[in-house]
């Protein structure tokens, strides 16, 4: 009966509740674990999660090919990935997919964190499915001219892809490697945007935004008004407008197309954590200059 209760506690993520049960977890090769100490349970928990991350780094290293300074476009411009193996592994761990036991509370708190090796594999398997779903949604959005949705889905797919153990192995049915294709698709969308001024009334500038020759059905952007960056009102059916600072209307205006949608990612704790862990620099092609004359 005791063994059954312990098994249920481990599977359900309930605190094991005793040092003896924690030692059993540590001795069982089916689990990867970490423990931490601190002046509070919260501090000890952070230390335990960091220790677990370090141990998983060793496990994953055996079959993980680190992607270092991977260029997002075949032309060599745009977006570089510079991140450590440790930060990528950290991105697969969240408070929701690891288990915790509080061994001691108070100013000498002691906390254990663990995950079953099979659970770790399930995390990566589920992530692969999400990547393919995002890519399918992105391609459909491209076909209908929904630039915002296409960029968001492509970029989120890429963030998830970079967190896999072997990102270069995830391919499309024709054998194409998504690690190359997603960056190319992101840059192609940005290259196929054209922005022009259709008129202005004082400091209010009317814009026309085309995507592959047709009115963009949706796009989000920010712009430099001559003194600061401001959020634009968005694009609907190829039409938008901006308000420049008084007297700041110049021959060229700079827009920055939104593609990461970090605010929306806050609804997905796992995706948000990965965005924080991966050091992805901005896509250069997301900055668009257009002439007002």
Question: Where are the predicted features?
Answer:
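Hydrophobic alpha-helical segments and their boundary regions
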Residues: 2-3, 37
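Sec-dependent N-terminal signal peptides
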Residues: 3-15
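Domain-level marker for long, solvent-exposed, non-transmembrane regions
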Residues: 18-293
């Amino acid at each position: 009966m005791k063994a059954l209760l312990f098994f249920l506690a481990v599977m359900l993520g309930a605190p094991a509740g005793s040092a003896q049960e924690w030692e059993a977890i540590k001795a069982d090769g089916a689990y990867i674990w970490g423990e931490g100490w601190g002046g509070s349970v919260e501090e000890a928990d952070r230390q335990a999660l960091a220790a677990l991350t370090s141990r998983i780094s060793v496990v994953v290293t055996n079959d993980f090919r680190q992607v270092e300074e991977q260029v997002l476009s075949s032309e060599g411009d745009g977006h570089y990935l510079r991140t450590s193996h440790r930060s990528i592994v950290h991105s697969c761990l969240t408070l929701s997919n690891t288990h915790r036991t509080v061994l001691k509370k108070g100013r000498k708190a002691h906390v254990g964190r663990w995950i079953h090796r099979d659970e770790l594999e399930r995390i990566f398997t589920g992530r692969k499915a999400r990547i393919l779903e995002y890519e399918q949604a992105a391609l459909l959005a491209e076909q209908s001219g929904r630039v915002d949705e296409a960029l968001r889905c492509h970029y989120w797919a890429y963030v998830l892809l970079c967190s896999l153990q072997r990102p270069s192995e995830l391919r499309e049915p024709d054998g194409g490697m998504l690690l190359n294709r997603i960056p190319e698709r992101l840059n192609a969308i940005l290259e196929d945007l054209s922005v022009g001024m259709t008129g202005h009334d004082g400091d209010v500038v009317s814009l026309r935004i085309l995507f592959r020759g047709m009115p963009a059905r949706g796009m989000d952007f920010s712009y430099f008004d001559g003194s600061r960056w401001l959020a634009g009102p968005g694009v609907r059916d190829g039409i938008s407008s901006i308000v420049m600072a008084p007297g700041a209307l110049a021959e060229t205006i700079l827009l920055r197309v939104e593609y990461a949608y970090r605010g929306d990612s806050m609804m997905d704790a796992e995706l948000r954590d990965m965005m924080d862990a991966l050091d992805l620099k901005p896509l250069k092609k997301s900055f668009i200059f257009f002439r007002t004359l």
